[in-house]
């Protein structure tokens, strides 16, 4: 099936190319702005975001995507080798984080996005948007959006590279990348092989089996495209990732598959200097522990530009299928966003109407505003709503229990902030609050099911400062967050309410050094601060991790690097009964040609 769809997509590209074979070939490759979902925004950034390019990712010393996420201070992270990874942005649930690959949603399995499907070496850049973005990206984006890009940026030059490394716990990684472009087209191909012996992730007293939990993954990615006419461009993005991840006691037994295959075709047609249309068709297949899922989406976005504003109007259809159970989650959305300048005020307004096949239509919206108070100081604010639909796990339980009245979770969000850019560096301060209504709650009846029951109030503040001192680039951030369940008045489980990060980097001749320290406060393991039997739940202690990395460039094309994660060998837990890696070392070599 996947091969047939690939042939169809390639055939469509050929047909479009043949229709414009005599046209003038122009510039190619457009990268979308993540916040406004357009390649040509007319206003500056308003949303709180974290952006990491390839060099930033290398500086962290991370060996896997989940290892990278663990180093980001404003994210509550749990998981590691041998167990599922959960990512919470600003105190929200893990299922409220929308994961995108090249702009396309990754379907939720096991109650949350599967971050282990994405190999780190395939990633060109990452953009993390904090806050509600359902109006722009659809249901699920309550806490934020993590957009992973596998394609090169527009400034890349024709080149090839090989990267190979070996590290603790028998971890071996090799990757090959080649990128070619000319005035008419581009092609980017990457292959990665990753294998590790892992660690014994769970204690025997909590269901573990006293053995290592190894994993292996082979991935290839292909990005190609170009202008096939003066006003028409096409792109084809593919990623095929196949893995076995040896979780303790998988269900069903002996099923360790963790595969992702995604293909996306995009066509952009420019009708005039002010009006263009983009069509994206995406097919995604996931195999996880013997269960098969398929996500098909098609979106059409029309952009109409004016002198100081832009209007986007789009339509999206999504069919998320649980193949084994012959069930699907379908919704059709109409969305719009206007952005522009109003008397020195930068404003964006958006809305999305979501028609979900299991219940009535609902609407989400957003209003964002910013203004430059001076040449160095900027103020911004936003207000909006977001929603989350039941995922396959929740929906299947309710169908079996004949409970079909589950409504979407909805949140209302407010944020205000100041940012400054000075000769000595930059700073940003944000405060925010969010109210989640109709939260899904699990009821252990026979059969079990979910119902709408509860409100969660979230409040927080974030401060970041960047400067340089004695040749060191210094970035620090402090985050405070409280996610309180209204029914209990208690902090939600596994959500440290304080975190701090300090990052120092320096280049001296051929040497590049990076020091990262991140600390998180204590938290409870359970939402109710009890373990379900009326006993006090385990308290997860606070911890601090020191991560070191250094790189030496023998030539412009040959480099060697050494990473030391958790250099002080800190013993800590992110979830009761689950172990985390101790001190690890990775030695690697990169060659460009």
Residue spans of the language-model regions?
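Face-selective signature of the C-terminal outer-membrane beta-barrel domain
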Residues: 225-243, 257-373, 378, 420, ...
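Periplasmic-side early beta-strands and strand-to-turn transitions of outer-membrane beta-barrels
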Residues: 147, 154-157, 163-165, 177-258
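Extracytoplasmic beta-strand/coil segments of soluble accessory domains associated
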Residues: 66-104
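Non-catalytic regulatory/gating segments with a bias toward low-complexity or hydrophobic composition
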Residues: 69, 126-128, 146-148
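Short, acidic, small-residue-rich periplasmic hinge/interaction motif at the N-terminus
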Residues: 21-58
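Short acidic/polar hinge/loop motifs at secondary-structure boundaries
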Residues: 104-132
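Gram-negative outer-membrane beta-barrel transporters
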Residues: 308, 341-346, 432-435, 452-528, ...
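Outer-membrane beta-barrel signature, preferentially recognizing the C-terminal barrel domain
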Residues: 97, 252-263, 267-270, 292-294, ...
């Amino acid at each position: 099936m996947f091969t047939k769809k690939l042939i169809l997509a390639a055939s469509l590209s050929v047909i479009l190319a043949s229709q414009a074979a005599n046209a003038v070939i122009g510039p190619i490759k457009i990268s979308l702005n993540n916040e406004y979902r357009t390649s040509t925004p007319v206003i500056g950034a308003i949303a709180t975001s974290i952006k990491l390019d390839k060099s930033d990712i290398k500086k962290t010393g991370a060996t896997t995507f989940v290892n990278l996420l663990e180093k980001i201070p404003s994210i509550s992270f749990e998981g590691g080798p041998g167990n599922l990874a959960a990512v919470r942005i600003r105190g929200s649930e893990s299922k409220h984080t929308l994961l995108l690959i090249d702009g396309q949603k990754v379907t939720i399995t096991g109650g949350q996005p599967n971050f282990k499907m994405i190999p780190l070496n395939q990633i060109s850049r990452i953009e993390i948007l904090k806050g509600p973005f359902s109006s722009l990206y659809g249901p699920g984006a309550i806490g934020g959006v993590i957009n992973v890009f596998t394609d090169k940026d527009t400034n890349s030059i024709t080149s090839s590279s090989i990267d190979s490394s070996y590290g603790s716990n028998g971890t071996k990684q090799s990757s090959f990348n080649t990128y070619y472009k000319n005035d008419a087209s581009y092609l980017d191909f990457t292959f990665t092989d990753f294998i590790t012996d892992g660690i014994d992730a769970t204690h025997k007293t909590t269901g573990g089996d006293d053995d290592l939990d190894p994993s292996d993954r082979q991935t290839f990615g292909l990005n190609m495209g170009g202008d096939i006419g003066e006003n028409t461009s096409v792109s084809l993005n593919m990623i095929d990732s196949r893995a076995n991840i040896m979780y303790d006691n998988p269900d069903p037994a002996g099923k360790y598959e963790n595969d992702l295959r995604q293909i996306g075709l995009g066509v952009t047609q420019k009708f005039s200097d002010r009006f263009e249309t983009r069509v994206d068709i995406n097919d995604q297949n996931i195999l996880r522990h013997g269960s098969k899922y398929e996500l098909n989406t098609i979106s059409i976005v029309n952009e109409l530009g004016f002198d100081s504003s832009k209007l986007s109007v789009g339509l999206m259809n999504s069919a998320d299928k649980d193949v084994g159970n012959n069930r699907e989650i379908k919704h059709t959305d109409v969305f719009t966003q206007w952005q522009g300048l109003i008397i020195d005020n930068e404003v964006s307004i958006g809305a999305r109407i979501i028609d979900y096949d299991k219940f009535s239509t609902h609407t989400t919206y957003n209003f964002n505003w910013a203004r430059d108070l001076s040449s160095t100081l900027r103020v911004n604010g936003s207000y909006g709503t977001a929603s989350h639909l039941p995922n396959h796990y929740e929906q299947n339980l309710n169908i079996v229990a004949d409970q079909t009245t589950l409504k979407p979770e909805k949140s209302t969000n407010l944020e205000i902030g100041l940012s400054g850019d000075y000769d000595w560096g930059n700073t940003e301060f944000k405060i925010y609050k969010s109210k989640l209504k109709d939260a899904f709650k699990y009821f252990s009846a026979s059969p079990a099911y979910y119902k709408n029951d509860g409100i969660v109030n979230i409040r927080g503040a974030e401060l970041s400062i960047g400067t340089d001192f004695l040749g060191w680039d210094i970035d620090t951030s402090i985050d405070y967050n409280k996610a309180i369940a209204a029914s209990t008045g208690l902090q939600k489980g596994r959500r440290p309410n304080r975190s701090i990060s300090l990052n120092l980097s320096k280049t001296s001749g051929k040497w590049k050094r990076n020091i990262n320290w991140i600390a998180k406060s204590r938290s409870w393991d359970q939402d109710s601060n009890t373990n379900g039997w009326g006993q006090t739940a385990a308290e997860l202690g606070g911890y601090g991790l020191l991560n070191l990395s250094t790189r030496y460039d023998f030539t412009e094309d040959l480099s060697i690097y050494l990473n030391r994660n958790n250099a002080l060998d800190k013993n800590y837990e992110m979830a009761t009964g689950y172990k985390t890696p101790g001190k690890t070392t990775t030695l690697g070599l990169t060659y460009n040609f």
